Amino acid sequence: MLYDANYDRELVEERQMCKDICHEYNMVKPSDLERRREILRKLLGKTGKEFLIEQPFYCDYGYNIEIGENFYSNVNCVILDGAKVKFGNNVFVAPNCGFYTAGHPLDVKQRTAGLEYAKPITIGNNVWIGAQVCVMPGVTIGDNCVIGGGSVVTKDIPANSLAYGNPCRVIREI
């Protein structure tokens, strides 16, 4: 389903509010872990009790993001959460990773009109995502996976897989 993310007043206001909260979060002293968690608990749709997202962190709405217990994200995590983005328990995200639910139509008239779509992303339990990985709209990564650095994940990855590449593909079972 296509929607107008660029000119829909409500969505623009929600993204602006989220940007302000992300800015506030990114300006908190790194050593003030409790304040950082407090801000993220207000911003994100659901969090586990124990989690840490290193600064800087950016997202579009925040309320579409769910993180499980013992979630850790290193610096420069970007989550474009036009749809639900769910991370399981014990997920480790290395630096400079992006999770992109948003996509744009191939039709030039629709695209230039500002229309886009969003598809959910699901990351299972016990997953390690290497540095500079891009996870694209609609992808599910199963439990116990390792995604190698620099990968572009365009299709689902089954549980218990080592996968890497551009496009990302399963290398072997682990």
PLM features: what roles do these ranges have?
Residues 128, 146, 162-164:
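Short-chain dehydrogenase/reductase
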Residues 131-156:
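Beta-rich strand-turn-strand
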Residues 57-67, 72-140, 166-174:
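Flexible, glycine/small-residue-enriched loop-and-beta-strand segment within the central core
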Residues 157-167:
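Acidic, glycine-centered active-site loop in nucleotide-sugar glycosyltransferases
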Residues 1-50, 168-171:
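Terminal amphipathic alpha-helical/low-complexity segments used for targeting or macromolecular assembly
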